[in-house]
Amino acid sequence: MSFEQPDFLKSQLTQTRDDDKESDHKKWRRYEAHDGIVFCIQLTPTMYLSNPDLGGKIQLLEILDSLNDLMSQLVVVMPSTAVGCYIYNCSHPNAEDNVYELIPLRDVNYKNMKRVSDLLEDIEQDRILLKDEIPIADPNNPIELSPVLIKVRETFLQPIEGQKQLTNKKIFFFTDDDKPAEFLNVDSRSRLRKVVDDLYDYYINFVTFFIGSEDKPFDDSMYADILKWGSKINEAQSWLSSHGPSTNPINASYIKSKVKRTKEIKRIKFRCPLMLDERADLVVSVNGYTIVSHEIPGSKYKLVYANGSVRREAYSHREYLDAETGEAVDNSQLSKVYTFGDEIIELTEDENLKIQSGYSEHESFLKLIGFRSTEQCLHYYDNIDVPAFVVPNEEDYAGSIKTLASLYRTMLFKKKSAMVWGKLRPNSPPSMFVLTPSSKKDYNQGFYLYKVPFMEEVRKLPDFLNHSALIESDDYKVMSKVTETLINFFNLKNGYRPSDFHNPALQKHFKILREYLLQIEVDKSKPEDEGDETLQKVKQIYARIASSAKSDDVKQQRLVKYLKLWNSFYNRLSNLEVDTKPTKNKKAKLNL
């Protein structure tokens, strides 16, 4: 469903008050990411064969399943992402030059999702055959890769009405043919290198899915030469050995997991200079990336109204009213003031800008104050905002990567964190931050930036009851030991990993919407899948306790015995009445 923007809204979106706001808009416009992902699948005879690594499932079906799952996930977390699928070496009647457009490159929508979902359902129910619906072209005369990539490039660059321009573009390239015929021809290889080079010029990147197996390993040497040789190396980054994508082959069983890992594109939260020593003019440039975002079910909706047989989107419009008369006040008559009691202070825009620029000549900046032991300055209860992942940016200050790499190694070795002061956006107030290096166990190498509170932002916690006598008792020590043993039984020391748990509220919300839109029939006689991994974990714990109670093995029986012991201690301690409040002296009643 598409909606037209009314004229008054278009004028409001394009209108700016002054040149400063216009330049500021241009400056931050590059952070408005619009991602595009194209599945580019090469048909080969082996794509239609059952793969033992997939439990006998056909490889091509696994790829289409991954496409279907990807769109279902993007609707939840990244609904503005555009997804398309192009299959080449295909003799479908609608194919152009053996390139079949299964779904066009559009923002995730109901029509494309239903197209893929219905196709998979028809194949699963044996209504159609995969070979008939997506037939392979003559294997003896396969199409070259160059025309396919040119078509994908044109698709990425083509403006689409109602959609923003794509800023992050990826090609998910699937093949199990490691020696295409065109690679043996010098002219074809040269032509393909130029096409790949052209794609990199337009910032279109590859994510390779080179499918191999033990019986037929995939030799990636030819593709590595094409994809990495054709890519360019920036002169300022000449120390990099390669600027191309990874061409490591994967097993077919890893297709879905790799699609899920690489679907999300890095979100730049801020970009600013980091002043290590302002007097010595030692400044580097950094990028901060968003680590997590909060998704709320039912929050992504639009207000529409019926205009005849067409639904149009309704937009909100703000008006300021006179407090006494209720008449609308023109925006040109409004001004910002600060009040202190009965006093009113009015500042002009220039005076406000002067106050904001008093901290630094940079609109956003980070300034190093000093270093401190990580154990002393990094506490979980001091983190008052979502942290950012910080890496060097070589564009503004040359040598930023080498400088921060050296700083990273030193801080990691000495177990230090940096205290920094600054602001991440032009209009935000300055704050205090802790910049700490990622641990050796962390897959990502870089820094985490945590915002910490000032004295005025700290609130008093409630007083705790005094249980010193209880804590020092022998019963409490035994209970602590029993609790520690129980935790070891259930392997809870690994802690909470978000990648193991979906949000059940989100999954339920979008599951209902998906079934409604795709007209999926639900068998109400079957028990509904809860879709909540936390409840599944609880059920596993219950099952383990039950098996321990029924087991004849002495070691297995220890679990239920520890639980009984823990419950007896807990019941005994909870029944103890700790009188912490002094009793009030009641007035004596007179019996008159």
Swiss-Prot record:
Stored InterPro entries: Ku70, Ku70/Ku80_beta-barrel_dom, Ku70_bridge/pillars_dom_sf, KU70_core_dom, Ku_C, Ku_N, SPOC-like_C_dom_sf, vWFA_dom_sf
One GO biological process term: double-strand break repair via nonhomologous end joining
Region (Disordered): 1-25
Keywords: ATP-binding, Chromosome, DNA damage, DNA recombination, DNA repair, DNA-binding, Helicase, Hydrolase, Nucleotide-binding, Nucleus, Telomere
Residue ranges with Basic and acidic residues bias: 16-25
Chief location category: nucleus
Catalytic activity: ATP + H2O = ADP + phosphate + H(+)
Compartments, as annotated in UniProt: Nucleus; Chromosome, Telomere
Pfam families in UniProt: Ku, Ku_C, Ku_N
Domain Ku: 280-485
Tagged with keyword Glycoprotein: no
GO CC annotations on file: chromosome, telomeric region; Ku70:Ku80 complex
UniProt GO MF annotations: ATP binding; ATP hydrolysis activity; damaged DNA binding; DNA helicase activity; double-stranded DNA binding; telomeric DNA binding
EC number, UniProt record: 3.6.4.12
The UniProt record lists the keyword Nucleotide-binding: yes
Described purpose of this protein according to its UniProt entry: Single-stranded DNA-dependent ATP-dependent helicase. Involved in non-homologous end joining (NHEJ) DNA double strand break repair. DNA-binding is sequence-independent but has a high affinity to nicks in double-stranded DNA and to the ends of duplex DNA. Binds to naturally occurring chromosomal ends, and therefore provides chromosomal end protection. Required also for telomere recombination to repair telomeric ends in the absence of telomerase. KU70, of the KU70/KU80 heterodimer, binds to the stem loop of TLC1, the RNA component of telomerase. Involved in telomere maintenance.
Subunit text: Heterodimer of Ku70 and Ku80.
Family recorded in the similarity comment: Belongs to the ku70 family.
Name this polypeptide is given: ATP-dependent DNA helicase II subunit 1
Lineage of the species this protein comes from: Eukaryota, Fungi, Dikarya, Ascomycota, Saccharomycotina
